[in-house]
A protein has these predicted regions:
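Cysteine-nucleophile active-site neighborhood
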Residues: 1-83
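C-terminal and late-domain segments of enzyme folds
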Residues: 70-116
Length: 116
């Protein structure tokens, strides 16, 4: 987030969205689209909370255990099925997760904003 803000990308991303553009965040990019990233153990940098971009109503807390799984997945809006790998660190929760981007091995993952 620090580098993204230092380069002015936060301003560009928000302007793109205001003009009707869509933003897709994968992995850490998804976490940065939320309100807050809490890293109490300094796993990804300085210990503490970092303000996200606020494009998704979600908050993330980082945990030291990294998850790596092969998954069977489905994109709920289109019912498109796919397979892949999930590399995951931390837990992201919030109201926008009620509109998941995907279902991985039958559980919801990711979020789609109210405005799509």
């Amino acid at each position: 987030m620090t580098y993204l803000r230092a380069q002015g990308w936060d301003i560009d991303l928000k302007a793109h969205r205001r003009r009707g553009g869509h933003v897709l965040g994968i992995c850490g990019g998804y976490q940065m689209l939320g309100n807050v990233i809490d890293d109490p153990e300094g796993i990804e940098g300085v210990i503490g909370k970092t303000e996200g971009l606020g494009m998704l109503n979600v908050n993330t807390i980082m945990y030291p255990k990294k998850q790596l799984d092969q998954v069977n997945a489905m994109h709920p809006p289109t019912q498109q099925k796919f397979t892949g790998y999930e590399i995951h660190i931390g837990q992201t929760e919030g109201a926008d997760t009620l509109r998941p981007f995907a279902q991985l091995n039958g559980r919801n993952e990711g979020a789609i904003s109210v405005d799509g």
